[in-house]
Every structure is written in C-alpha cells, then in structure tokens.
C-alpha cells in the first residue's frame, strides 16, 4: 500500500513539474504531522509561482504500524495517509529573513479496523476520506526554513472523545 501511495505522490509531482521548473525559489521540506496520537511522515515541494506567492504540494505517509485504542470488548487500529497543498504570500523582512503566512487544504484517507478484544478476530472496517482547511506559517532564514501548520481533526476519524488539532512541523531547504 505504501508503495502505491509513493507512486501516486511521484505522479502528482511529475504532473506539476512544469510549474515548478518555470518559477523561481523552489524548496523542499520534510517533517512529521502529529495526528491524534499518531505520527505521520510529511514531505513537501514548492516554489514561487507569482511574485511573492508560494505554492506547495505534499504527501503524508504512516511512520508506525498504526494507533490502537480499546473500546469495551473491541480494540481499533487506525492507519492514515494523505496529500496536502498550501498557498502563501511571502513577506521579505530583509535579505536573510522571510515570513510566509499559508492557507491550504489537507486530504486524509483514514482506515479504522475493529477487532474482538479476547480473540483478536476482525469485526469491522471504517474507511473515510476527509478534507480539512489548514493554517500555517513558513519562516525562512537564508536558505533554511521552518514550516508549521495546523488543522482541526474531523471528530468522525478521531479515536479520542476530545476535539483534536493536527500539527505539521517540517524543516525546509530553499534552493
């Protein structure tokens, strides 16, 4: 499954390559999204598509084997993967410092499998596709940057009873 997801991400990058190739200031970023007690690897590629306007496209893939939670006589295992995109306006403070507020859209594919507590037998699967808006900021110092974004987790995909916020933290390198 992960191989298919990586293939999909590479296909999307290849389709968007002409946009990145013609524009200035490309960057690549990598980090982690903390999603409901679940860590998801995040990779992103972006560039300046208009003067001071940055656009990026990224991919999220699971790092671990999945989050597990117990519900009475059942336990559940959750797997998450997704895509994200963001658009930002770069504010150049000086030659070495730029701040880019970002808004974006995050897509998550979530699969939750339920198992019997005592026997470990499979009981049911719940699969969902969710889109959530994101807010964030990218801070660049010379050629190194930090991207922090957040979005509210849909309560239908959370194994927690409380409202949760996903946080994506990535280090970026500007070419």
What are the language-model segments listed below?
Residues 19-69:
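Short glycine/proline- and aromatic-enriched beta-strand/turn motifs that initiate or cap beta-hairpins
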Residues 26, 39-45, 81-85, 131-135, ...:
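Hydrophobic, lipid-facing positions within transmembrane beta-strands of outer-membrane proteins
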Residues 139-145, 162-175:
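Outer-membrane beta-barrel "beta-signal"
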Residues 32-36, 59-65, 91, 105-111, ...:
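Transmembrane beta-strands of outer-membrane beta-barrel pores
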Residues 1-25, 175:
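Cleavable N-terminal export/targeting peptides
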Residues 55-57, 61-81, 107-131, 154-162, ...:
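Flexible, solvent-exposed loop segments that connect beta-strands
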Residues 26-28, 51-57, 95-99, 141-148:
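Repeated loop/turn-to-beta-strand initiation elements of outer-membrane beta-barrel proteins
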Residues 30-42, 93-95, 154-165:
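Solvent-exposed loop/turn segments connecting transmembrane beta-strands
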């Amino acid at each position: 499954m992960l191989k298919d997801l990586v293939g999909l991400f590479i296909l999307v990058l290849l389709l968007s390559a002409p946009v990145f190739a013609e524009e200035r200031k490309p960057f690549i970023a990598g980090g982690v999204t903390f999603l409901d007690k679940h860590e998801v690897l995040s990779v992103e590629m972006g560039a300046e598509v208009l003067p001071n306007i940055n656009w990026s496209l990224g991919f999220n893939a699971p790092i671990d084997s999945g989050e597990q939670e117990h519900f009475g006589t059942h336990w559940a295992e959750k797997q998450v993967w997704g895509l994200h995109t963001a658009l930002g306006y770069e504010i150049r403070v000086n030659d070495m410092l730029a701040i880019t507020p970002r808004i974006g859209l995050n897509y998550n594919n979530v699969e939750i499998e339920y198992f019997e507590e005592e026997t470990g037998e499979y009981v049911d699967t719940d699969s969902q596709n969710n889109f959530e808006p994101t807010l964030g900021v990218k801070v660049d110092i010379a050629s190194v940057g930090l991207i922090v974004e957040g979005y509210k987790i849909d309560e239908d995909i959370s194994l927690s009873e409380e409202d949760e916020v996903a946080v994506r933290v990535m280090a970026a390198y500007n070419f």
